[in-house]
Amino acid sequence: MDVEGAHAAIRLPEGNRWDWDVIAWDGGQLRLAAGYDLAYHHDLELVFGDPFFVCCPGTFHDPVFRAPTAEELLRVTRQVGEEPAVVVAFEADAGGQEPVSCLIAAERFEVVRESVLRYWREDAGPDQRFAPWVRSPDQQVASGPAGPLPTTD
C-alpha cells in the first residue's frame, strides 16, 4: 500500500479491477474485493480492521480513490469523537446516473493481493484460496447448500 500521509489517497497495485463488492463485514473487519469478473474470482482485497464508519454500496464499479476532504474528516471525527487512524474516500459507479461518494474509517488498513476463487475447484493451487461461502461438494452434502439440515427429533 502506498500512502503519503495519514489520510492521503490510496494507490492500488496495477491491474484490471473494475468490479468491486463487500465480501465480508462484521464488527472486526470490512473486506472489499476487486477483480475484472467477480462471478469467478477476485485478486485484490482492501481489508479495514475495526471499521467504525462505512458509507458505500455493497457492489460498485470503477472506483476512483482520492484523499478525503476536510469536510469528510470533520464529519467522521464529529460522529466518532476522534480523528480516525484510517479514512479512505472514493467515487464509484453504483448503477445510478451519477457516481456515489464513499467513505470508510477504520483503525487499520491493508491491501491483500491473492487469487480468491468464488467457486469450488478441486485442483486449486497453493497460491489460491476460496471465498468464505465456497464449500467442497463433500461439505455441501453434509450441511446442505444453506447450512445444516434441520433434525426431526
Describe each PLM feature range.
Residues M1-D153:
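Surface-exposed, interaction-prone regions used to assemble/regulate multi-protein complexes
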